[in-house]
From Swiss-Prot:
Cofactor note: Binds 1 divalent metal cation per subunit.
Enzyme class name: isomerase
GO biological process: pentose catabolic process; pentose-phosphate shunt
Keywords for this protein: Carbohydrate metabolism, Isomerase, Metal-binding
Organism: Chlamydia pneumoniae (Chlamydophila pneumoniae)
Catalysed transformations (reactions): D-ribulose 5-phosphate = D-xylulose 5-phosphate
Protein name as catalogued: Ribulose-phosphate 3-epimerase
GO molecular function annotations of the record: D-ribulose-phosphate 3-epimerase activity; metal ion binding
Gene3D superfamilies, per database record: Aldolase class I
């Protein structure tokens, strides 16, 4: 087993107190989050509704953190420009949501932000390598998209290893990162790091009230010691 390495941690704002998103964004910043992950759901691609460009803009006004917008929507082309205007720094679209993936990823980059491609748990990643040159990040969903609080899907680990091998083979180690989204906690994070993940997105684990402070949970997810002053 390879040595665990520190990763980037991005809390999903969907798990926060939605009545005070500005305050929550500031708390995430102060706790040492690397970025904020914003889930956009349209009620069709996934069976839930969440935010729109106005919420992205409000969060952007509340924090200096990098904003990652995860578009779990059909017809993503229609919304890219509004997401960018609202303050998105990276936009993730789903492989299952469009037939023109390469064109979509290229368009996102043309708009001046980073582009990511997400794969839902039941989608084969057999053809992932052909899309990697167009991506700044590839997102492997480790829960079914739509709701927080789900358990980590163990078969994600072999997907991470597959993606890591493909990125290395294509010589994209410095330009394409692997992100794992869903069910990330103290148990699943080390497995993801060991398999080759670069970025972890977490929600329930980070926001649930227990004896650990938020900043300590972030350090644990990164694989770093906490409680040392």
């Amino acid at each position: 087993m390879k040595k665990q390495e520190s990763v980037l941690v991005g809390p999903s704002i969907m798990g926060a107190d939605l009545t005070c998103l500005g305050v929550e964004a500031k708390k995430l910043e102060q706790a040492g989050s690397d970025f904020i992950h914003i889930d956009i759901m349209d009620g069709h691609f996934v069976p839930n509704l969440t935010f729109g460009p106005g919420i992205i803009a409000a969060i952007n006004r509340s924090t200096d953190l990098f904003l990652e917008v995860h578009a779990m929507i059909y017809n993503p082309f229609e919304f890219i420009e509004s997401f960018v205007r609202s303050g998105a720094d990276r936009i993730i679209v789903h492989f299952e949501a469009s037939e023109d993936i390469k064109e979509l990823l290229s368009y996102i980059k043309k708009c001046g932000v980073q582009a990511g491609l997400a794969f839902s748990p039941d989608t084969s990643i057999e053809f992932l390598p052909s899309f990697l040159p167009f991506c700044d990040v590839v997102v492997l969903m480790s829960v079914y998209p739509g709701f927080t609080g789900q358990s980590f899907l163990p078969n994600t680990i072999e997907k991470i290893a597959f993606a890591r091998h493909a990125i290395k083979t294509l010589g994209l180690k410095d330009s394409c990162l692997i992100e794992v989204d869903g069910g990330i906690d103290q148990q699943s994070a080390p497995l993801c790091r060991d398999a080759g993940a670069d970025i972890l997105v977490t929600a329930s684990y980070l926001f649930e009230a227990d004896s650990l402070a938020m900043e300590d949970k972030i350090l644990l997810l990164r694989g770093e010691n906490y409680g040392v002053k």
